[in-house]
A protein has these predicted regions:
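Cytosolic regulatory/linker segments at or just downstream of nucleotide-handling modules
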Residues: 1-75, 80-95, 99-108, 112
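Intrinsically disordered, low-complexity, charge-biased linker/tail regions
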Residues: 111-124
């Protein structure tokens, strides 16, 4: 569980992105589906678009995700540590917990050679 206030799919994000600040959280494959879905959290209203700290948070978060998808586990984990305190401000500590747990699991258990960086949800 990402434990964030609002979680939306790409189709909803496309409808609201001009009115709200969104952070792209993850790419997931829902149980029973083949194609991955990008999921977002709604983090603030239009006025929040001027929040420099929020932009910086998102930049580091997306950097962490690039490291994660590229299997650079140490760099990804370091980025989650940098995100921990600002994540509290935005109600996203659960998201950081999810990524830290995944990174620990993936670097200790390895990943398949064809892993595409998409998390497979095993339950609906």
């Amino acid at each position: 569980s990402y434990d964030c206030r609002v979680l939306i799919a790409n189709s909803t994000a496309a409808c609201v992105r001009d009115e709200f600040v969104l952070i792209e959280l993850d790419r997931v494959r829902v149980k029973g589906k083949v194609e991955p879905e990008t999921i977002f959290t709604l983090i603030g209203d239009r006025a929040s678009k001027q929040d420099r700290a929020l932009h910086e948070f998102d930049e580091v978060f997306q950097e962490m995700r690039r490291h994660y998808v590229s299997r650079r586990w140490a760099d990804a984990f370091k980025a989650t540590e940098r995100l921990r305190i600002p994540a509290e401000k935005y109600g996203l500590t659960g998201v950081i917990d999810v990524y830290q747990a995944r990174i620990d699991q993936l670097r200790s258990g390895g990943v398949e050679s064809d892993w595409d960086g998409v998390f497979n949800w095993e339950t609906k």
